[in-house]
Each structure stands twice: as C-alpha cells, then as structure tokens.
C-alpha cells in the first residue's frame, strides 16, 4: 500500500485534471481499478489512520488520539496470523503523543524525519535563509516555522528529503523480500501535505514564477480577495509537490514490474483526505464543513486475483473498506466489530458494499453520503453541546489531556465495540485546540445544516432545499449512527431522534 497525505482527487489526471503533471497516476489508472465514489470516514490524520487499522468510524466517540486497547488493528491481525507487516513512513504524527502506538502494531517499522516542523535537528543558530516572522510566513507559530527551516537546512539534495528516503526504504524492503510469500508493506509519505517544500525540478514543470512569494505553508482560515495571489501560489506549489509524489509512485510501479510482483501482489494507492486551496473561500481543512475537496478521495486498487485493469467503479467505498480488503486478500476472517467490507467483488462487477456512509470530525458536522447526495448535519445549538470524549488513551496531538479535562472524567458503560470495557467519559469543552475541534462552540453551528447534489453540483456551490431528499438522508444518518453505537448525546447535539 502506497499512502499519501492530503492528496487532492481533483488535482489528478485520472479524475479530470488536465494541467497537473502526473503521468504515473494516469499509468496507475490504466493498470488498476479507479474508484469514483471513494470517501473519507474519520478525519483528519490520526482519526483516518485509526479507521485504517480498525475498519470502523471513530469520530463520534473521540477526537485525534492513539489506538485504544480494545481496537482491532489490521496490521496486528495480519502479524498475528503469520503475515509479516512493515511500515516505512515520514508521517511524524506517528512519533507524537497522539499517534504513539500505531506503528507498534506492525511487525517492523522504519522512519525518516523532517516533515512539517518535526522536532528533528537541534540547531541553535538560525539557518541562513530562515524567513523570520516579519516576512510572508507570519501565519506559522515561530517555533514550528523555525524548526521546519532548520530541518530543511539538512536536506541539501532530493535524496535527503523525507519522501525520497521513505520510498527508498520501501523499495529496499521489496528488493529483500519480493521472493517471499505473504507480507504487507505500507509505504506512507506525508507529502503532498503542507508545507509545500519541493525540489526545483518539479517546479520547472510549470510555467509559473515560484520565487515571487516566499511562503509555502497555508494557514487554516477563511480567505478574502486580497489572498487570491497567495492562493494561486499555494495551488501551484501543491501541483509541483504532487508531481514529486507522481515520480515516486512511478518508482514503486517500476520496481513491481522489475521484480514480477504484478502477478500476485495487491497494490493500493490511497490518501487520508484532501485539502482546500481556495475553494469555498477557504484554505486547509477542519475549520469548515467537509466539502468534496476534502472528503471525496482518490483510490486505486490492483487486485491480482481478478486482474481488473483500467476499470472505474462507481460504488460508494470508504477508508474503512481498505483494512477489510487486505484481510480478505490474505483469507483472514474480519473482526466482528469491523464495519468496512472487502472490495474484491466491487472491483470485478461494481458490487455495492453500502447504501450510505458516515464521515466527519469529532465535534463538527456529522455527514452522510449515498454517493449522490451529501448531507451535513450541523450542531443544533450554538454551544455545540453536549459533547464528550470516550477513551482509555487521553492524549491530544502533541500532549496529554490536561488536568482540567481529566478532572471531568467519569466511567461510562461499555460500547458494543469496546469488548466489555467501560471507558472514560471526558467533557470535551476544555479541548486542546489542536485541530481535533473538540470543545469548539458556535463555528459549525453558524455554517448550518447543508445538503448537496454532488452528481449535478460536484463543487457544492448550490445547497439544496429538498425536504424529501433531506428526510431520506436524515434516516441514513440516524441508522448509520446507531450502527456505529454513537453516544446518545451525539443525537442530542445534532437535534436528532435516536
């Protein structure tokens, strides 16, 4: 599996983009099955990866955090059934408090350092080209910005960059183990996640002057007319970084060809979510509704059992289906609590695996799609209450839950998927403000509930007012929440009958 972070579907040639240079993604679409209705589940980074391990949504119960003691982990299940699993990654959130036990589920793992302010090198003097916070890059916390530029000073050549090192480690694993049977390799790079640090040779593919603005790291905020030039700059940088990702995708495909792996080796190419680059007058994610640019994702699967090439599937699939597909490939029974479904039959004949699917962020809109419509249910009150975290692992992205948060903890009855374990119930009003959104108040309430017809309005510019469709989508939402054993107060927060 080759996994990218924040890879935009609408920026790829197989999904209709005619200006981003990414020939290997087109080559991949000709080799594999391309999914046209692939959606996220839980977001952003670590919640998406928890979905990838467990095959079930987690955003209704807690925010960003580690795997829980009761979670089923796909890589660990493979490992325990005699299938060695290996992770190579530069996704530095794995080495932080809020992601600290994902990589340990694999049989073995290797890392490369230096992405997005990763606290890697400890240089006490500023790099020569450091853009001090009185320049174009004022939006970043000074310590994160400085650390990122310190890291860059140690990447003088492309081969020193995290994506290059990560893919090289993955190719090394293939070289050593390609003759063996039954193994799982996850090559996971943080690119094309921001900041958009990219070698010049990929920028040279575009007719654009990248030197005119010294800023490659978008803020998470609403934008105005004065931001249009910077928006174009970010979009071009993102395109150049996608071209870099495309190059390394090509290396993986080339090596599979050289080693004869296409005959018996599944390849999955996926992402966790997308990223807004000015659409809907926003940059980034998490601070706004989860529009298609974020929630509707690229997904490609080559299954050597059926050898389906160049086909497009229109069935609704999600991140939670990937672990189910992998377990099925190795003839391993799916855990009882896994909600994702294997996609083998979908690849062959577009067999549906669900009527509708949930997606969202803890404490924000709860969204449901049937592949035709997207319904975004907003909080029913400006306080966005009641809202709780349910966990045995009280950690945010970069730090533990605060003492004040933990002082609100009580023990709640087990959920259907916690294997008889009661869990801590912690008031989310003291949230850590670390992109998990827990504890935020009126922001999502002010956006209101939204309904879109994404077949006729894929850019979601024209919200629908259709009582009949909304009623059907509410029923999909309610049933999916019940199936996920959502906490009762989530229904109350959204103004829904349970």
Give residue spans per PLM region.
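Histidine-centered active-site microenvironments of extracellular/periplasmic hydrolases
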Residues: 20, 195-208, 255-318, 354
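Active-site-proximal N-terminal segment of extracellular/periplasmic enzymes that hydrolyze or transfer
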Residues: 1-33, 42, 79, 447, ...
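A short beta-strand-to-alpha-helix junction
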Residues: 18-21, 40, 65-72, 232-244, ...
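C-terminal, low-complexity/hydrophilic appendages and adjacent surface loops
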Residues: 292, 362-465
